[in-house]
């Protein structure tokens, strides 16, 4: 077999492949064995028609398409290897010659990976992120943890305040007419949660139990119910009950409840500070890496094939479908609720898809330029890390993946990202007051 590659305009080229006649004849033999089982010829049992009779009756041409189907996949794969091209989409194939006793010749218009012209990726100016944990951040984390242990207590006296949970009855109307879904009794609402129409919760602040009030709000222009979007509504509202969160004091006992390894408040704070400091350092490093990736990608010039963007869009839509499925929705239901269709969703995602493709191509090109590879030791370390993270054995991970190619590529790219950050020039950011 022979193959030639002729680069055309942009990221396309013409792959011309010639398969020797010997293989063509073998493929025709295979095609005949398949086709003969499916035809009826008077005087012969099904599947027992001699080849000469078959060709006399139907012509050898009746076998050509099946022979092409047999020859094409392997021939195309071998041609890709021989010419060392990297297709990014299915080719457009045109058969030039298929005939018994002659070579099989076909042409394939192939879109290949684009040329990547790297710009500067070392010495990038990156903003140095703050890693020191402040006392305020520690206290905020403590308050957040104590908040999970808070109990809701009925407020006997007093008024509704931000953070309280109120039990209310309400009836909404637009232009004096009640609308569907605008009425409820015994509804619990946390003030400040932002779960109601903008302006509603704030107007309940200062109200007392058994007090009634007309709450006037305007539905957002982008409200999902088109008949209400942008309209002013009045909600006749009554407060039935007010509850507030009673947060426990941080004692040695509570500290142990929050952290089994801490027996005192001081031990709890020390352990928490250590964990938060480690997380802040990790988060800071990740932000710095993201900035380095973005700048290296921005400095790179690539003519990205539309086929690669479409493939990435397919992946992103699939990821989106999986996310909303976890919320009990499927894509069609989401489209009905949102008023979008898949075309609009893909258009909305297109810029991100292009950026993803450009980033991946940039990082891969840097890996090649720097001759960065993932060693067996690197892969073993990553497998051990995954084993601890997901609490499953290394062997089970290998069996699930089938091979370690994905891990190998991930580790390789992570090494590139480390290189970008390690070679960056850090500058101090402007601290906010």
Curated annotation (Swiss-Prot):
The EC number on file is: 5.2.1.8
Name of a matching Pfam family: Trigger_N
**What main location does UniProt list?**
cytoplasm
- Please state what class of enzyme this protein is: isomerase
Cellular component, GO annotation: cytoplasm
Question: In what residue span(s) does the PPIase FKBP-type domain sit?
Answer: 163-248
State one molecular function term (GO): protein folding chaperone
Q: Which reaction does it catalyse?
A: [protein]-peptidylproline (omega=180) = [protein]-peptidylproline (omega=0)
Q: Is the Ribonucleoprotein keyword given for this protein?
A: no
Localization, UniProt: Cytoplasm
Q: What does this protein do?
A: Involved in protein export. Acts as a chaperone by maintaining the newly synthesized protein in an open conformation. Functions as a peptidyl-prolyl cis-trans isomerase.
Q: Would you identify the family this protein belongs to, as annotated?
A: Belongs to the FKBP-type PPIase family. Tig subfamily.
Q: What is known of its domains?
A: Consists of 3 domains; the N-terminus binds the ribosome, the middle domain has PPIase activity, while the C-terminus has intrinsic chaperone activity on its own.
- UniProt name for this protein: Trigger factor
Lineage summary? Bacteria, Bacillati, Bacillota, Bacilli, Bacillales
**Name of the gene:** tig
């Amino acid at each position: 077999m022979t193959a030639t590659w002729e680069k055309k305009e942009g990221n396309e080229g013409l792959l011309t492949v010639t398969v020797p006649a010997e293989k063509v004849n073998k493929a025709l033999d295979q095609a005949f064995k398949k086709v003969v089982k499916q035809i009826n010829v008077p005087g012969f049992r099904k599947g027992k028609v001699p080849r000469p009779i078959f060709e006399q009756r139907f012509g050898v041409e009746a076998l050509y398409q099946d022979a092409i189907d047999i020859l094409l996949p392997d021939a195309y794969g071998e041609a890709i290897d021989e010419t060392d091209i990297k297709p990014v989409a299915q080719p457009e194939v045109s058969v030039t010659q298929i005939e018994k006793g002659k070579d099989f010749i076909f042409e394939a218009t192939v879109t290949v990976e684009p040329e990547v012209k790297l710009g500067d990726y070392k010495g990038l100016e990156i903003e140095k992120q703050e890693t020191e944990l402040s006392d305020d951040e520690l206290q905020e984390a403590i308050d957040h943890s104590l908040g999970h242990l808070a109990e809701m207590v009925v407020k006997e006296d007093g008024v509704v305040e931000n953070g309280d949970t109120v039990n209310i009855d309400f009836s909404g109307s637009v232009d004096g007419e009640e609308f569907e879904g605008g009425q409820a009794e015994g509804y619990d609402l946390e003030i400040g949660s932002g779960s109601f129409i903008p302006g509603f919760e704030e107007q309940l602040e200062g109200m007392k139990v058994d007090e009634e009030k007309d709450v006037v709000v305007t539905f957002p222009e982008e409200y999902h119910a088109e008949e209400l979007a942008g309209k002013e509504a009045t909600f006749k509202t009554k407060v039935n009950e007010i509850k507030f969160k009673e947060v426990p004091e941080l004692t040695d006992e509570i500290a142990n409840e929050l952290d089994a390894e801490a027996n005192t408040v001081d031990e709890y704070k020390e352990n928490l500070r250590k964990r938060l400091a480690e997380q802040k350092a990790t988060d800071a490093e990740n932000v710095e890496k993201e900035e380095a990736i973005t700048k290296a990608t921005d400095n790179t010039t690539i003519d990205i094939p539309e086929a690669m963007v479409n493939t990435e869009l397919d992946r992103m839509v699939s990821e989106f479908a999986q996310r909303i499925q976890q919320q009990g929705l499927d894509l069609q239901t989401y489209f009905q609720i949102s008023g979008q269709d898949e075309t609009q969703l893909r258009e909305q995602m297109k810029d991100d898809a292009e950026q993803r493709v450009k980033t991946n191509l940039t990082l891969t090109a840097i890996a090649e330029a720097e001759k960065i590879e993932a060693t067996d030791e690197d892969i073993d370390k990553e497998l051990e890390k995954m084993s601890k993270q997901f609490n499953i054995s290394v062997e089970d991970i290998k069996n699930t993946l089938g091979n370690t190619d994905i891990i190998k590529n991930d580790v390789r790219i992570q090494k590139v990202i480390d290189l970008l950050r390690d070679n960056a020039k850090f500058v101090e950011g402007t601290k906010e007051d």
